[in-house]
C-alpha cells in the first residue's frame, strides 16, 4: 500500500500559504495558526505543507536550516524577477520559503503599504509558479489574510493556459477583516499584470480601490474566519468593514472555525516559565504560590488572598482600553491588584504608568512584551480582563482558561464562542461576560466576579475547574478544517 493510498482514496494534499508562521516569523495570532495547525492533521490522510516568504529579518538559526531546492525567473507584468525556493522540515512538516532579496529585505515582515502591495503580489504569484517545480500539486491551497488574497485570482487566471492548475481549490481565511490590502487600481494593475477584467466592482475593486482581501473572498471556493460569532458579525455594517454586503453574498460558503492554542507550549503542569507547576487537581494550593512569586517580582503588596487581575494585550482601542481608562480609578478602589503587560497606543501605555505610580502596591505596568512574563501572568492571576470592541477569535482567553485564570470578557466574536458566562443558579460557566460596549457595564461585571471570588470561594474554584477542563487544543480546530476540506 503506497503512502497516497488508504482504502482506495488518495491522500489529500494541502498547501497553507501565509506571510508568517511560528516558530520562524511572528507578528501576531496569524503565525500561531499557520505554524501550529499543520501538525494536528491526520498524517494518514493529509499531506500538509506550508509556504512562506524568506525574510531577511528571520533569525539566523532558521536561515541556517534552509536547503536550496530550485530557482527560476518570473514575470510580474513588465518586471522579470528572481524566485528562489528553499525548504526545511520542522515537526514533521515541510516548509517552503520563497526567496527574493529585493522584496523581503526589510527589518520587519511588513513595511509601508506601498511596498507591501507589490511584495505580496509577487509572493502570491510566486507561490503558484513554484508548484510545478517542487513537484507538489495541492488539491487545496489554504490562503490566510490579505497578503495571500491574490492567490485565488492568479489561480483563476493561470487555469486558462495551464492544465496543471485546473481543479485546484482554494480556501480564504480571514483573521481580521480590518486589514484588507488596498491601493490604487492603476498601480495594482501595473504591479500584478492581471487583465482589466479583474478590476471590476464585483471582483477586485471596492470603493474605487483595488482590494486584495476582497479579491480573495470573491474567488476562493470557501471562506472561513476564526470564530462562528465573528462569521455572523462581519455580515453587519458595524463589524463588516465595508465588506458586509460581500460577506452576505458569500454566506453559503462562509464558516467560522475557532483557533486553538498549542497545549504543549501552554501547559501549567510542565511549563518551565512559571514558579510552580499545577493541574486541575491541585491548583487551589499551587496557583497561590505563583501569585506570591509574581507579587514579589513586581513589587506588589504580598497577599495571597487579594484578587489579582491580569491583562496581556496590545494596548489599543480595539482591545477595549478606552473602557478600562474610563473606570480605572474606580477599579483601583476595590480590593484587587492589576497586572498589565503589552505595548501599543501611547495614551494607554501612559495610563497604566500613571496608575502604577498612583497605586504602587496595586498596579503593575509592564510596558513591553515578554513570552515568559505572559506565562507568569496566566499562571498567577485569578482573573483575566479582555473587554474587546471586536475580537475575531482571541487567543489570550484560551490561554487563561488553560491556566485556570477566569476570563472576564465582552460578548463579541471568539470571546462569545469560547467563554461561557457564569450562572450562579445552575452552577455553570467558565468566566464572566458583559454585552454592551460600556465602561460601567464592564466594571459591574468585574465587581460581580470579585463578589464570587471573595464571598463564594467554592463556586469560584468550580469555575476554575470547568475552565481548566475545557479543550481548546489545535486538535479540535484541525478536525473542523478536515471536515471543510472533505466537503470541497
What are these regions (language model features)?
Residues 2-488:
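Catalytic cores of nucleotide-sugar-dependent glycosyltransferases that transfer UDP/GDP/TDP-activated
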Amino acid at each position: 500500500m503506497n503512502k497516497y493510498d488508504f482504502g482506495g482514496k488518495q491522500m489529500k494534499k494541502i498547501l497553507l500559504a501565509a506571510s508568517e508562521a511560528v516558530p520562524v516569523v511572528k507578528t501576531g495570532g496569524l503565525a500561531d495558526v499557520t505554524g501550529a495547525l499543520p501538525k494536528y492533521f491526520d498524517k494518514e490522510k493529509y499531506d500538509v505543507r506550508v509556504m512562506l516568504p524568506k525574510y531577511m529579518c528571520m533569525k539566523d538559526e532558521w536561515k541556517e536550516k534552509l536547503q536550496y531546492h530550485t530557482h527560476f525567473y518570473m514575470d510580474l507584468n513588465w518586471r522579470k524577477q528572481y524566485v528562489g525556493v528553499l525548504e526545511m522540515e520542522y515537526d514533521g512538516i515541510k516548509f517552503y520559503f520563497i526567496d527574493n532579496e529585493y522584496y523581503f529585505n526589510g527589518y520587519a515582515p511588513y513595511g509601508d503599504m506601498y511596498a507591501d502591495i507589490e511584495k505580496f503580489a509577487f509572493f502570491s504569484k510566486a507561490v503558484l509558479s513554484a508548484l510545478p517545480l517542487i513537484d507538489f500539486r495541492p488539491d487545496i491551497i489554504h490562503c490566510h489574510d490579505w497578503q495571500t488574497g491574490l492567490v485565488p485570482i492568479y489561480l483563476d487566471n493561470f487555469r486558462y493556459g495551464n492544465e496543471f492548475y485546473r481543479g485546484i481549490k482554494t480556501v480564504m481565511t480571514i483573521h481580521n477583516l480590518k486589514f484588507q490590502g488596498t491601493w490604487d487600481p492603476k498601480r495594482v494593475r501595473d504591479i500584478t499584470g492581471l487583465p482589466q477584467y479583474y478590476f471590476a466592482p464585483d471582483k477586485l475593486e471596492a470603493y474605487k480601490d483595488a482590494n486584495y482581501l476582497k479579491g480573495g473572498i470573491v474567488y476562493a471556493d470557501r471562506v472561513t474566519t476564526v470564530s462562528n460569532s465573528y462569521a455572523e458579525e462581519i455580515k453587519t455594517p458595524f463589524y463588516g468593514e465595508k465588506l458586509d454586503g460581500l460577506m452576505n453574498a458569500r454566506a453559503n460558503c462562509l464558516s467560522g472555525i475557532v483557533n486553538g492554542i498549542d497545549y504543549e507550549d501552554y501547559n501549567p503542569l510542565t511549563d518551565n516559565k512559571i514558579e510552580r507547576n499545577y493541574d486541575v487537581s491541585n491548583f487551589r494550593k499551587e496557583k497561590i504560590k505563583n501569585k506570591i512569586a509574581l507579587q514579589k517580582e513586581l513589587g506588589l503588596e504580598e497577599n495571597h488572598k487579594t484578587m489579582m487581575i491580569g491583562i496581556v494585550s496590545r494596548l489599543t482601542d480595539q482591545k477595549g482600553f478606552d473602557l478600562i481608562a474610563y473606570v480605572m480609578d474606580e477599579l483601583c478602589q476595590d480590593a484587587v491588584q492589576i497586572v498589565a503587560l503589552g505595548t501599543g497606543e501611547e495614551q494607554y501605555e501612559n495610563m497604566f504608568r500613571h496608575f502604577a505610580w498612583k497605586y504602587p502596591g496595586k498596579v503593575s505596568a509592564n510596558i513591553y512584551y515578554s513570552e515568559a512574563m505572559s506565562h507568569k501572568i496566566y499562571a498567577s492571576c485569578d482573573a483575566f480582563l479582555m473587554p474587546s470592541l471586536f475580537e475575531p477569535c482571541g487567543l489570550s482567553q484560551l490561554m487563561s482558561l488553560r491556566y485556570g485564570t477566569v476570563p472576564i470578557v465582552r460578548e463579541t466574536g471568539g470571546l462569545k464562542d469560547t467563554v461561557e458566562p457564569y450562572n450562579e443558579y445552575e452552577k455553570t460557566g467558565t468566566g464572566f461576560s458583559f454585552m454592551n460596549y460600556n465602561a460601567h457595564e464592564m466594571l459591574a461585571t468585574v465587581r460581580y466576579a470579585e463578589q464570587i471570588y471573595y464571598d463564594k470561594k467554592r463556586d469560584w474554584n468550580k469555575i476554575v475547574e470547568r475552565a481548566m477542563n475545557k479543550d481548546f487544543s489545535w486538535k479540535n480546530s484541525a478536525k473542523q478544517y478536515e471536515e471543510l476540506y472533505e466537503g470541497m
